[in-house]
Amino acid sequence: MSMEMASVATWTFLAEVPIPQDVLGVLVEGEQPYAAFKTMRDSAVFTSKRLIVRDAQGLTGRKVEIYSLPYSAINMWSTENAGTFDMNSEVELWTRAGHIKIKLGSQIDVRKIDRLISACVLISR
């Protein structure tokens, strides 16, 4: 099933990393971090309520933009595992904000991401 549309955001998750301590400052009461991933310039964290993507900008990285995608905004998602010639897996999210594509590094288990999104999206409904 191909649903081609322009992405409002494209992120690349390179590897799973420990949960950054500074993300705790943006969590609401009762929100728990589940997993974190290194991105090209910063990190992404799956929590019990949303996906948080931090994007450090500039030469010093002191300017930080934070994207927050509540699971309730996700209408549909797809996952694609790596193939013989295509070494990277992908996750696509169709949200109220638009289409988001996440490219996964070869060391990331796409099925773990699928289970994580499934649990969070379906529980939040």
What spans do the regions from the language model cover?
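Anionic N-terminal interaction surfaces
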Residues: 1-44, 107, 111, 123-125
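C-terminal, charge/polar-rich interaction regions
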Residues: 115-117
